[in-house]
C-alpha cells in the first residue's frame, strides 16, 4: 500500500479533529483581521475569533453563498494584494459575472498536495503518463491536474479538450497509462475508438482514468469500465475551493476529503448537522487557503460524509457520490451553466421576446443543450438571411458567456408555453443509467 503523505493520511480521527480545530481557529483569526467581508459578517452575528473553542463552534460563523461572489466581483474577497499572488483563475458566475479566484504559491502547493495524495491512492506513480483532456486556461481543471501530476513525477501529455482523432492517435502511439477528462468525453473517446476499430485494451496502455466535472451514475461508470478495461476514479472539486481536489482511492468507495485541508459539514434543510452517513447539503470550509478564504461556503451539492476508516488504510472522511443540487445550476460538459446567465443574454437581443426554454439530453453520453428563444412580433420576418444573422449573433454571444457551444433555435411568437405561476424554463432529459 502506497501513500503520498502516510503520517497525515493515516492519522487517527481524534488527532485529525484536533488539527482541524487548530487550523480553524487560525483561519478565523487571520480572516477576521484581514477580510472586511468576513469581519462585517461576524460582527453582525456578534461572533469574535476567540469564540471558536470547539469544532461545533463553526456553526456560530456566517455562511458564504454564491451571491457573495457576485456581489464582491472581481476581487472584493481577496485578502492578499496582487503582488503576493502567483495566479488568478476565472470561472462562470450566477448572472454572467465570473468568479475570480486568486492563489498564492502556498495555495497552489496545497492544491497539488491534495491531488497528489489522491492520485497516489489509486495507484498513479512517477512511471505513469497522464493524458490530460481537461480544458486549460482560465478553467481550473486542466492546469490543476497537470501541475499535480508533474509534482508526482508523472509524464503529462497536455492534449486539452477536442480534436478527438488526434487524442486517440497519441494514446495509441505513446505509452499513455492514465487519462483525465469529463465522463461524457471519456465515453466519446470510447465511441470513436469503436468506430475506428481500435481496441483500447489491446492497442493502448491506458488502464486508469480520472473522471470529473459533471455528474454520472455508478452504472455508467461500470459500463465504461467493462467496455474499455480502464478503472475510472471520480474527482470532486470547484474553482472556489482551489479547483479539482478530491479523488477516490483504489477501493472506489468515495472521495477522500483531507481533513487537514478541508472541513466539510453536511446540513439538513434547517441547517442542522445530519448524522454520519446521512445525506444533506455540503458546506465547505477551506482550512489553509491564503488569498481567497472560504468559510462555510454553500457549494450547492448534496451528499453524505463518513468518518469510517477506508479499506485502503486512510483515516480521513469520505464524501459519497453527489446526489443532486440545492440550486438551479446545471453542469453541461463539465461547465457550470445558470439559466439566469442565458436569460441575461437573451434580454440583450432586441429581436427576442422574454420567453425561452432550455432542453438537455445526453444522447451517446455527450451532453447537448438546446436553447429555444422566441422572436418578438416586431422582428418577425421571412427573410432567411436576416434570420440567419439573428441566430448567429445570439449563438456568438451565448458561447462568449457560457464557454460551451449550445444549439440555438429561434421560434415564432406564441410558440413557447406560458405559465401562470413560476415559469419552467428547463427540461433535463439526461439519463445517467
Task: Go through each PLM region and give its residues.
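Active-site phosphate/ATP/adenylate-binding loop shared across adenylate-forming ligases
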Residues: 1-7, 18, 64-227, 233, ...
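Nucleotide 5′-phosphate-binding alpha/beta core
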Residues: 1-90, 95-113, 117-121, 270, ...
Amino acid at each position: 500500500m502506497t501513500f503520498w503523505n502516510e503520517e497525515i493520511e493515516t492519522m487517527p480521527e481524534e488527532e485529525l479533529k484536533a488539527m482541524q480545530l487548530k487550523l480553524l481557529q487560525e483561519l478565523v483569526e487571520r480572516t477576521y483581521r484581514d477580510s472586511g467581508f468576513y469581519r462585517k459578517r461576524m460582527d453582525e452575528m456578534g461572533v469574535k475569533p476567540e469564540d471558536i473553542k470547539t469544532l461545533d463552534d463553526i456553526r456560530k460563523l456566517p455562511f458564504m453563498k454564491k451571491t457573495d461572489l457576485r456581489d464582491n466581483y472581481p476581487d472584493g474577497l481577496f485578502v492578499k494584494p496582487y503582488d503576493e499572488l502567483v495566479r488568478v483563475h476565472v470561472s462562470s458566475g450566477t448572472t454572467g459575472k465570473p468568479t475570480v479566484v486568486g492563489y498564492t504559491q502556498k495555495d497552489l502547493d496545497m492544491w497539488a498536495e491534495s491531488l497528489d495524495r489522491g492520485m497516489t491512492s489509486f495507484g498513479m506513480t512517477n512511471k505513469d503518463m497522464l493524458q490530460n483532456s481537461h480544458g486549460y486556461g482560465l478553467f481550473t481543471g486542466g492546469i490543476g491536474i497537470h501541475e499535480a501530476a508533474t509534482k508526482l513525477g508523472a509524464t503529462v501529455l497536455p492534449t486539452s479538450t477536442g480534436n478527438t482523432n488526434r487524442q486517440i492517435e497519441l494514446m495509441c502511439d505513446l505509452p499513455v497509462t492514465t487519462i483525465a477528462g469529463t465522463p461524457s468525453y471519456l465515453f466519446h473517446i470510447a465511441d470513436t475508438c469503436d468506430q475506428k476499430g481500435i481496441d483500447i485494451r489491446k492497442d493502448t496502455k491506458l488502464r486508469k482514468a480520472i473522471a470529473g466535472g459533471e455528474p454520472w451514475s455508478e452504472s455508467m461508470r461500470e459500463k465504461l469500465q467493462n467496455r474499455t478495461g480502464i478503472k475510472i476514479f471520480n474527482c470532486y472539486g470547484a474553482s472556489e475551493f482551489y479547483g479539482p481536489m478530491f479523488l477516490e482511492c483504489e477501493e472506489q468507495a468515495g472521495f477522500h476529503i483531507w481533513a487537514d485541508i478541508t472541513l466539510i459539514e453536511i446540513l439538513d434543510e434547517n441547517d442542522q448537522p445530519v448524522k454520519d452517513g446521512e445525506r444533506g447539503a455540503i458546506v465547505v470550509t477551506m482550512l489553509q487557503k491564503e488569498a481567497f478564504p472560504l468559510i462555510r461556503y454553500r457549494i450547492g451539492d448534496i451528499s453524505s460524509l463518513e468518518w469510517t476508516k477506508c479499506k485502503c488504510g486512510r483515516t480521513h472522511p469520505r464524501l459519497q457520490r453527489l446526489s443532486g443540487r440545492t440550486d438551479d445550476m446545471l453542469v453541461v460538459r463539465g461547465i457550470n451553466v445558470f439559466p439566469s446567465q442565458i436569460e441575461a443574454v437573451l434580454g440583450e437581443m432586441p429581436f427576442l421576446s422574454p420567453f425561452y426554454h432550455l432542453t438537455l439530453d445526453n444522447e451517446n453520453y455527450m451532453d447537448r443543450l438546446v436553447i429555444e428563444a422566441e422572436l418578438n412580433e416586431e422582428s418577425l420576418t421571412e427573410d432567411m438571411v436576416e434570420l440567419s444573422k439573428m441566430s448567429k449573433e445570439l449563438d456568438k454571444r451565448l458561447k462568449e458567456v457560457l464557454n460551451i457551444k449550445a444549439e440555438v433555435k429561434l421560434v415564432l411568437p406564441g410558440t413557447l408555453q406560458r405559465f401562470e405561476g413560476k415559469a419552467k424554463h428547463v427540461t433535463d432529459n439526461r439519463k445517467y443509467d
